[in-house]
């Protein structure tokens, strides 16, 4: 009976966290409340609530921040410079211009994919692409309601998790646990990319054609965001920072770090080169790209550089802290006795180790209600 109540309580806590997040409540507040509800259902009034919050919850919170704050910070600075330099807008305009209005959905998807694969934050890509997507969809007379799907397919799927070399945090989180780099399992990654991209485009094309047959067009909207027509750099200059990240990341992770003596990490830092080299490769790639953008656009950036760097640093905190909050929730759920039961069930779903890992991580990510935060919590539990 106690186990059943505990499992019910865990799902109640997850549901509460999801509902509060969808309602616009702060995850930073909702996550610990949901975690303590799970503790209450599992242990009753003997749940040691303060210890669960200040020790278990905050340990998961702090560990995630320690491991991934540099990636969030560098990513935010890179994204900010790509935005204010006009590079992101230049890439978006180039892709949509070359593919044309008849391939509006494909142009938006590919542009988002290029930007996210180059290291631009998912959130920034959504904001940068919205005005461009609006202009393209309006010209092609495609329903506006399909814009979120097109942006999500390009930014939040294969370039976020599957395409080899992606610097997005969801692709870099596993490096710490598996001792790999961001280029790990390239064949599987490419296969997954083809499935995600192909399936997503097939669905979006189906919905577009269905809307056209029904006579549904873009529609009329007031006070709409429109694409900024400011002067932007040439496509070669705009795309260079993305190539820099990819090349530096690849060279360091495949050629440099494998030949470096990392024994000092074990002796002085209680760590290993394998656990850190992947993250370092991504960070250094972003750093070189940031310096390149700043140098090339110095005259354009110098006046507001201090303020923009400050904004970028501040903007890196919100997604990081939200993910930390959810990882803290995952740390509490992992400490519950019922979590072991659910974990054993998840791991025993299939005798195939790879399939079992895929299914179990999906289940545990669902339990922790976050992509990056849930992935970190799931890998921590399965490590």
What are these regions (language model features)?
Residues 59, 90-100, 134-139, 307-315, ...:
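Short amphipathic alpha-helical coupling elements at transmembrane boundaries
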Residues 69-75, 98-134, 320-331, 342, ...:
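Hydrophobic alpha-helical transmembrane segments of multi-pass integral membrane proteins
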Residues 23-27, 65-68, 79-89, 116-128, ...:
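Short helix-coil transition sites and intra-membrane helix breaks within transmembrane domains
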Residues 1-75, 80-92, 96-99, 201-222, ...:
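N-terminal alpha-helical transmembrane segments of multi-pass membrane transport
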Residues 112-129, 139-189, 193-206, 364-377:
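Alpha-helical transmembrane segments and, especially, the helix-loop junctions at the ends
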Residues 3-5, 10, 187-308:
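Long, contiguous bundles of hydrophobic transmembrane helices that form the permeation core
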Residues 9-21, 32-41, 72-77, 111-116, ...:
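Hydrophobic core segments of alpha-helical transmembrane domains in multi-pass membrane transport
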Residues 54-89, 274-340:
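Core transmembrane alpha-helical segments of multi-pass membrane transporters/permeases
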